[in-house]
């Protein structure tokens, strides 16, 4: 395998994982902020706010795992000579 191709695949995979981690962290933080703000304003609505919060966090984390799959594709599916 050409070292340039291997280096590009590893750098690309690292950028994919870094971008996905940053995006997931920001998304989870925004969702958590909305949950805390909503519970602080209306404590009795806590039960109704948890379900959309966990759905949002689950979707954000699912997007991160899709990034993980693309990273594996780029890193492990590089052409081998």
Curated annotation (Swiss-Prot):
Question: Which cellular component terms (GO) are annotated to the entry?
Answer: plasma membrane; proton-transporting ATP synthase complex; proton-transporting two-sector ATPase complex, proton-transporting domain
What InterPro entries does the record tag this protein with?
ATP_synth_csu_bac/chlpt, ATP_synth_F0_csu, ATP_synth_F0_csu_DDCD_BS, ATP_synth_F0_csu_sf, ATPase_proteolipid_c-like_dom, F/V-ATP_Csub_sf
Record bears the keyword Transport: yes
What GO molecular function annotation could you give as one example from this UniProt entry? proton-transporting ATP synthase activity, rotational mechanism
Tell me which residues are marked as the site Reversibly protonated during proton transport. 61
- State the annotated membrane topology for this chain: Multi-pass membrane protein
Residues spanning the membrane: 5-25, 57-77
Q: Keyword Cell division on this protein?
A: no
Query: Could you tell me where this protein is found in the cell?
Result: Cell membrane
Question: Which keywords, in A-to-Z order, does the entry hold?
Answer: ATP synthesis, Cell membrane, CF(0), Hydrogen ion transport, Ion transport, Lipid-binding, Membrane, Transmembrane, Transmembrane helix, Transport
Its predominant location is membrane
UniProt family annotation:
Belongs to the ATPase C chain family.
Under the subunit heading, UniProt states: F-type ATPases have 2 components, F(1) - the catalytic core - and F(0) - the membrane proton channel. F(1) has five subunits: alpha(3), beta(3), gamma(1), delta(1), epsilon(1). F(0) has three main subunits: a(1), b(2) and c(10-14). The alpha and beta chains form an alternating ring which encloses part of the gamma chain. F(1) is attached to F(0) by a central stalk formed by the gamma and epsilon chains, while a peripheral stalk is formed by the delta and b chains.
Q: So what does this one do?
A: F(1)F(0) ATP synthase produces ATP from ADP in the presence of a proton or sodium gradient. F-type ATPases consist of two structural domains, F(1) containing the extramembraneous catalytic core and F(0) containing the membrane proton channel, linked together by a central stalk and a peripheral stalk. During catalysis, ATP synthesis in the catalytic domain of F(1) is coupled via a rotary mechanism of the central stalk subunits to proton translocation.
What is the name listed in the Swiss-Prot or TrEMBL entry for this protein?
ATP synthase subunit c
User: What organism is this sequence from?
Assistant: Mycobacterium marinum (strain ATCC BAA-535 / M)
| Encoding gene per record | atpE
């Amino acid at each position: 395998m050409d070292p340039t191709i291997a280096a590009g695949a590893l750098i690309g995979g690292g950028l994919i994982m870094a971008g996905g981690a940053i995006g997931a962290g920001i998304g989870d933080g925004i969702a958590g902020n909305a949950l805390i703000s909503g519970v602080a304003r209306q404590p009795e609505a806590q039960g109704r706010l948890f379900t959309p919060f966990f759905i949002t966090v689950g979707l954000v984390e699912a997007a991160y795992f899709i990034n993980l799959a693309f990273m594996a594709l780029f890193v492990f599916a590089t052409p081998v000579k």
